[in-house]
């Protein structure tokens, strides 16, 4: 699961759909099958209320990425994969970062969870 949180002052400044699709594709194609396709979810929420730094820069903005995944992925995979993903995210925002103050963050959390997901069944039938 990836949750993207972005400041409202970035509205219209980047292609949110393309960003979400890039991340989902990355998880499908570059993660060595570690993330089951049926479990990949990417969502985004605009932050309308926020304070950044000293609250004196009206153009200051952020995009935060929170990843939650089930426990047990090897540490070396996590390091390699999320370093590469963050590099792709940074490149996605390179032009915007050059034009305005922008903070990008990626946090990864291993979580214990309870699941019921019939999307896996649909994917098996489709293949």
For the regions a protein language model found, what residue spans apply to each?
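A domain-level signal for the structural core that forms small-molecule/cofactor-binding pockets
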Residues: 1-127
């Amino acid at each position: 699961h990836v949750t993207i949180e972005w400041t409202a002052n970035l509205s219209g400044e980047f292609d949110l759909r393309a960003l979400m699709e890039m991340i989902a594709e990355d998880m499908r194609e570059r993660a060595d099958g570690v993330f089951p396709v049926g479990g990949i979810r990417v969502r985004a929420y605009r932050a309308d209320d926020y304070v950044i730094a000293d609250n004196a820069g009206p153009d200051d903005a952020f995009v935060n990425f929170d990843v939650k995944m089930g426990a047990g992925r090897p540490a070396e995979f996590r390091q390699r994969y999320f370093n590469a993903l963050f590099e792709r995210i940074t490149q996605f925002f390179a032009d915007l970062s050059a034009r305005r103050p922008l903070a990008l963050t990626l946090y990864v959390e291993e979580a214990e969870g309870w699941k019921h997901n019939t999307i896996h069944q649909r994917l098996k039938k489709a293949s």
